[in-house]
Amino acid sequence: MTPAAVVMSNYGEEEIVRPIADFSPSLWGDRFHSFSLDNQIAGKYAQEIETLKEQSRIILSASSRRTLAEKLDLIDIVERLGIAYHFEKQIDDMLDQFYKADPNFEAHEYNDLQTLSVQFRLLRQHGYNISPKLFIRFQDAKGKFKESLCNDIKGLLNLYEASHVRTHGEDILEEALAFSTAHLESAAPHLKSPLSKQVTHALEQSLHKSIPRVETRYFISIYEEEEQKNDVLLQFAKLDFNLLQMLHKQELSEVSRWWKDLDFVTTLPYARDRAVECYFWTMGVYAEPQYSQARVMLAKTIAMISIVDDTFDAYGIVKELEIYTDAIQRWDISQIDRLPDYMKISYKALLDLYNDYEMELSKDGRSDVVHYAKERMKEIVRNYFVEAKWFIEGYMPPVSEYLSNALATSTYYLLTTTSYLGMKSANKQDFEWLAKNPKILEANVTLCRVIDDIATYEVEKGRGQIATGIECYMRDYGVSTEKAMEKFQEMAETAWKDVNEGILRPTPVSTEILTRILNLARIIDVTYKHNQDGYTHPEKVLKPHIIALLVDSIEI
């Protein structure tokens, strides 16, 4: 909530003082509004990709001549290059075969730190509940990791990456993280490229907690420097990246035109203009071509909830917001006449958007699932209103009361539900499961909430906001800002463990459904890096990623 400022406005017969928003303008202008697909280049890429895809399939299949370490390395490379979605079943079958052939990891090859670490991480990421006690073989009699490992940089790097898939009570992985981090930080300045770049990058952003598409773009450039690279896989990855980027640019152009036609920048100047950042967010949830419709729908929803959020946070007064909240609960265009003129604009746009969703999904007989997204929208608006009243009344709730309300205003209940709308594979049972707030969803929402609270604390404090999570915790427990932030960081770590646990088999829904939740968690780790709010202030955090993924293509 922004502080009150002298912006006079009439409401009935009385003059009111509104807040002033201080959001920076869009970084992008009209850059993405139009995109003309070069069909000749796209066709050429697609043709080459089909040939390379078949060659890559053969490379994956020709495993009998490779050692276990080479097979695992190959799968890891294919996944990091962003082309694994072409070979999902083949990769799943390979990993299943490795696991069933040696479920206790007794082969001598597993005495190699890199091999065991890669296998452990890959199996965990694919849902296998593998015990981390396997790493005991690398510890001494005192239960500490052997100092002799400190010279095995690739082994340490993969141990570090493996430690990020940890769940609750896995102390050995906590020790693995501390041990590998310390030795990698010490070694990094003395390494040669590309290994030095990989170590520095990993310490900045772990693979498991990063946005897959961001990691793909980075890894393609790193893999090109490798002496032992596979040229077929590299060329396939480059072409696939560029072809998929063309689709992403088309989608962003559609979202940008929709946003421009709404003209909120002119009619609702108090709100954030972040359509491009909204689309980037969706690429983190799913980048693959089959999710094109889903990305566009999710991007529009994020942009719309941003407008609603800013209406509560940066412009509206309580009596207006009360009517606005009630109108959204009723979800009927006839309610529009009750609203102030500026609210009519966003109210109509909101209802129109969901009507569009229903029409679009009716083509596949799925219009009924829009109901679940509407209910999440109503929920978040109710909770926004509670926060607005707290601010106006100067009320600081107990931290438990704060969190029970603020989990919804993190937007992640809404965004997770919306992420399934455009997924043809998401059925009513999946939406019902999600509506019951399963543990993995609760963890994801908590993660978003507490990391956002840490990142935005200083800014909100400067605006006069007292009902922040950090302030509430400090007041309740009589601790310093630093201690409160440490506690929230602990809550985030606990939430990550719940997310990691939630993707392990057996699962109540498909891996495809669960991956959206995992990816939403990953977006938080990237967007709020170093406690910065990358969405509100995208200049430092998101701008380089957006340029890498949506502006610059890869040189072929």
Swiss-Prot record:
InterPro entries, per the entry: Isoprenoid_synthase_dom_sf, Terpene_cyclase-like_1_C, Terpene_cyclase_plant_C1, Terpene_synth_N, Terpene_synth_N_sf, Terpene_synthase-like, Terpene_synthase_metal-bd, Terpenoid_cyclase/PrenylTrfase
Reaction equation(s) it catalyzes: (2E,6E)-farnesyl diphosphate = (-)-vetispiradiene + diphosphate
Protein name: Vetispiradiene synthase 1
Needed co-factor(s): Mg(2+)
Pathway entry: Secondary metabolite biosynthesis; terpenoid biosynthesis
SUPFAM superfamilies for the chain: Terpenoid cyclases/Protein prenyltransferases, Terpenoid synthases
Induction (free text): By infection with P.infestans.
UniProt free text on domains: The Asp-Asp-Xaa-Xaa-Asp/Glu (DDXXD/E) motif is important for the catalytic activity, presumably through binding to Mg(2+).
The protein's Enzyme Commission number: 4.2.3.21
Entry GO terms, CC: cytoplasm
Species in which this protein is naturally found: Solanum tuberosum
Root EC class: lyase
The family this protein is said to belong to: Belongs to the terpene synthase family. Tpsa subfamily.
Keywords: Cytoplasm, Lyase, Magnesium, Metal-binding
Localization in the cell: Cytoplasm
Positions with a binding annotation for Mg(2+) 2: D309, D313
Family matches, as Pfam families: Terpene_synth, Terpene_synth_C
Residues annotated to bind Mg(2+) 1: D309, D313
Cofactor note: Binds 3 Mg(2+) ions per subunit.
CDD domains, per the entry: Terpene_cyclase_plant_C1
Residue ranges annotated as motif DDXXD motif: 309-313
Domain of life: Eukaryota
Residue numbers binding Mg(2+) 3: D452, T456, E460
Function according to Swiss-Prot or TrEMBL: Sesquiterpene synthase that catalyzes the formation of vetispiradiene from trans,trans-farnesyl diphosphate. The initial internal cyclization produces the monocyclic intermediate germacrene A.
GO BP, one annotated term: diterpenoid biosynthetic process
GO molecular function: magnesium ion binding; vetispiradiene synthase activity
